[in-house]
Amino acid sequence: MNLRKKDCKIAVIGTGNAGIISAIMTIYTYRLLNLDEPRLTMFHDSKVPTELTGQGTTLNISHAIEKIVCDEDLNNPAGITPKVGFYYRGWGKKNEKILYKLGENAMAYHFDPPKLRQAFLNKDLVDVIEKHVTPEDIKDDFDLIIDCRGKSVNNWDEYYDMPSPTNYCLLGRTRDGRPPEVWTEHIATPDGWTFKIPLEDGYSYGYLFNDKITSPEIAEKNFDEMFGMKTLHKVPFKGYLSKNYYDQKNKTLLNGNRLFFFEPLESNATPMYGIAVNEFINSVIRHGEKGAVYAKKKYQILIQETYQWVMWHYMYGSKYDSEFWKYAQDQSKNYKYSKHFLSMIDYVRRTCNWKKYVGQNEFPERIISEFDYNDYATWYFSNV
């Protein structure tokens, strides 16, 4: 496999969120390496519905979006909003509110997936073909195929089961102007937890619970009562991870929901989509086919630890002593974490200055817009 050659051709199957992120990260990786960009082709099948996904990133994806697509300036075609960290409300027993930054003065983005998709395609950086294809159909025409077709429902033997405390999500949306918050909120509820994402024109909500403990009908009622939110979509799910990240025979790298799905705590999916592409291309360019094997092993370890990171968040329960939280806490405490993960957690415990993160992170009452964000950032970073 030679991804360095000038006439390199890469295909992305699927133009949903994972497909778009894969294409963006492919271009971004080649530009960082100062290499000629490959001929990039995206295959779109309008008969396949796009999976409903979250809209949060961490630093790797945000840098790529800013360099390849757009930033907040010039009419903000991707609908991005700033994100400085995660705000936990009601998690654990000691502190009602905890906000932590992504890193010193670092900033990521929230985004509107349909807007990001269209903004990227409008750049004319890729060829888009409306056609249903499989990797086997096109393997002879491309040097690498990134398969983002979503999860097939009938091949569970090809995946590891990755259970989590939640298995169901109710989605809601407001459209009432730009919110003031610049963080993703994770709000504990008696049934589970809810994400609240500030977008350009309102909030995106996701009410997560376990349907073995709370019925969807009761959860829908509670979603409305707690957040004033009408359910737009009901999404049952299960956690899984593909046993084969890279198919050497068909030169195919899996990504998106074709590769894995975990519950959306800490916006884990989108950044992992970017890492999958970046790590693989970098390794293959440097080491050829051996690099593909190395990237596969490294990514499997990383994604396993991402899953452990999600599970660990339930370790100390929440302010609710509900059936769900007792179940979630037991599942977290009984999980067999890797030694490397536990050593990482121990290091964070010993070295982190938690006073920076607890009890002083309310945002100002005035509305924050893109025009006074710099003033807000100055206030924020002087108060955490």
Locate predicted features:
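Feature captures the FAD/FMN-dependent oxidoreductase FAD-binding
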Residues: G79-K151
